[in-house]
Amino acid sequence: MWLASRSILVFILSLFLLSTSLAEARSNHGYGSELIQSVATAELSPEAIIALKLIKQGGPYPYPRDGVVFGSFEKRLPKQQRGYYHEYTVKTPGVRSRGARRIVCGQPVECYYSDDHYETFKRIRE
């Protein structure tokens, strides 16, 4: 009984220390930028590749909100001044609205892909 209680206590303490370390990493390094994974352009969906090409050539964009300033209120991208990031829609087959997929870019071209409406991001590697 004592050994089981001790094991549970060690497990709970380990979880606490891990969560504290992650929270500290996020707060000390500006918006959790160290936690962002990456994705190669070739690994993106065909729709994301088309959107990325339109971004690089400056349009024309299929959605009126494409190119608007992205506020990064979710604080999941590296911290920058307001106006640095702009968002663009990635068309989602079978969805009548804009859907959840986005590409967010800063200047110089530093782009991130989100397939879950800004919950997670992957930096796009050329």
Q: Language-model segments: which ranges?
A:
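Generic signature of intrinsically disordered, low-complexity, basic-rich segments
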Residues: 19-21, 47, 88
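Small/flexible residues
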Residues: 8, 28, 103-104
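Bacterial N-terminal signal peptides
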Residues: 7-20
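N-terminal secretory signal peptides that target proteins for export/translocation
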Residues: 1-4
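Functional cores of ribonucleases/endoribonucleases
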Residues: 56-126
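N-terminal secretory signal peptides
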Residues: 24-72, 76
